[in-house]
Amino acid sequence: VSLIATLARLEAVRAGRAQPAATVRHRHVAERPLVFVPLTTAGEAGAPLGALIGTDRDAPRLLAVPQPRDRDLRFAFLAELADVILPYIDSYADTVEAAERSETDPETGKRVKVEVELCADAPQLIVPSRAGIDFVRLLGRSMRFRRTAEQDPEAPHPAPPRVPLLGRWLTHFGERARVPGSSLLLALSDVLARHWTTGQSSLEDQHLGALLAWIAPPEGVSGAEAALRAELARDAAGQLECPPAGPATDPAFDNKLLAPAIERYDRARTALAAAEDGLEADDRLGALTAAEQHIRALVEQCTRPTWEKVWDGLDLLRTLPEGAHVAERWTRDRWSFTGHRDRVLAGEPPQPRRDDAVTAANKLATREREQARLDAQEALDDPLVMAGRRLAGEAFAGEVTDVAMAYSEGRRPSPRPLVTVRTDDRPHLGERARAYRSLGGKPQSAEFVGFAEDGAPEEGGPEADGPEAGGSLIVLRILDKMGRGKEPEAGSVPEKGDHLCFTLFEHEQRGGAKLPDPEQTPWTHGGPPGEESVPETPDPVTEEDVL
């Protein structure tokens, strides 16, 4: 945990409410996000119980599974879910704009610019907490390999037509959520905790009600008291006043309300199956419908408070101005969405259960690169985040006290001005360390020369590792972004009196070495493939799949 985060947490405890951890919003929030509040059944991994879903706060769609162990009812739930999510996704897939992308020419092997389609916008899925993202991944894995009756007429339990397609999309959303800075699938608790620091632990921040209680406590109540009430307060029936954000449910809800309701539904269904005439069947059908409606009411009772809190959290996030680099990261999400749309339209098979060596290495490299890029961009966008980097010795800010023109040695000398900066920060500067500042949106690099004292610079070395080694005057040599001429271009060199901020981390991340194609991968890493790969089959049917 960084020093500034610890200080903010202590300040939140002292003040009794959450403290800002950012001055701008570092994640994209769509105008019309799809909010998904799922519930699962205790005792069986991934068995859906119900959900509230929709893009309109006042008109959510309620989905429920009266008997979660019944495979047919599960498929009916997934089909309803597909009827909501897929039209929402399709509404973004058809509106495109022209864009340029660099691709390798197969004939020449050179990188060339090609014009391609890019979706003008992309869908955004919001779940209450990190566990919701895990559930989306689990749903995607369980659905994308299912076979429909059209694909396999002899399948014993064919899936509804659009269920496998929904599984592919949910898998894509879940994989994209692993990329730092992506906003296609967001856990609201994580986003709120990124922008506000509470007086509780990061694990407790996963409780959406407690987190919002710290950020916006009721009048006259401290954040700690409001959070404790959100976590523990129960009504006269012993039910939590603020149900968990899901997808797991509260044991008291399961034991006292849900289990009796499901037993009532099972009895009504058994009675309907045993009806001997039409009149008796009509009466028992009414009892079955009433039992089902009761379960739907329980699901809504458990999800509605979370639904309202998710929209409250989105309203809080919208009060913050968007960071300068958020649009750039959202554009990468749009490229990702467009690429998956094209793969689906091209008829490619579902994503495999396990990535091959090259794909896995590429994913890991992408995530590492995007994490470094996100850390740098958040600091450049937000003075409060930059303050944390300065406290950590990874950046420094100060006033330019002197600029001395100097030139490089060689046949064609280039300008290499020496800039002296007075700072109160204590950056971790080593010999010839690089520093960077933002100049017109591009990074300008400089080299650490040494600490200056009484106007004379001391050459930096291992022993010159802080202001105590030579005072708080830092001498830097500007290296680039000054034009091609003998004299620097106007505005490219700092002037005396300028207030600057230099970072010791790079602002832009370079791509790594290109990995071989799967056909060229050594056998030690899973290749080359001996025969053509075949589409993966669904998970085997177990006793738990059928009631």
Question: Can you describe what each PLM-predicted range is?
Answer:
Residues 115-128, 133-142, 146-346, 444-474:
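Alpha-helical structural signal
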